[in-house]
Amino acid sequence: DKRTKKVGIVGKYGVRYGASLRKTIKKIEISQHAKYNCNFCGKDSLKRKAAGIWECKACKKVVAGGAYVCSTTAATTIRAAIRRLRDAHES
């Protein structure tokens, strides 16, 4: 049985800090505790070690990422730009 219906992981804060702040924190905490896909071994075992440090539990690789999410939107944009430039350079 579920203990909470809507508060989820931020139930630990109880009535403190205000509803909208707790809602924001809920999104962050869910993403930071989630398991992500490892680019090296392909398994869903990349977990947050510290702010911006992500470690794969399977292959023990450590990668830098976002503070709360493994890959940031800025990093994705840069990666796409680099790939596009590399393809243009090769052809």
Swiss-Prot record:
Claim: Ion transport is one of the keywords in the record: no
GO molecular function terms noted in the UniProt entry: structural constituent of ribosome; zinc ion binding
Highest classification ranks of the organism: Eukaryota, Metazoa, Spiralia, Lophotrochozoa, Platyhelminthes
One of the protein's GO biological processes: translation
Zinc finger (C4-type): 38-59
One CC-aspect GO term: ribonucleoprotein complex
Database matches in PANTHER family: 60S RIBOSOMAL PROTEIN L37A, LARGE RIBOSOMAL SUBUNIT PROTEIN EL43
Listed NCBIfam families: eL43_euk_arch (TIGR00280), PRK03976.1 (NF003058)
Pfam families xref list: Ribosomal_L37ae
Metal-binding is among the record's keywords: yes
Stated name of the protein: Large ribosomal subunit protein eL43
Keyword annotations of the record: Metal-binding, Ribonucleoprotein, Ribosomal protein, Zinc, Zinc-finger
Family from the record: Belongs to the eukaryotic ribosomal protein eL43 family.
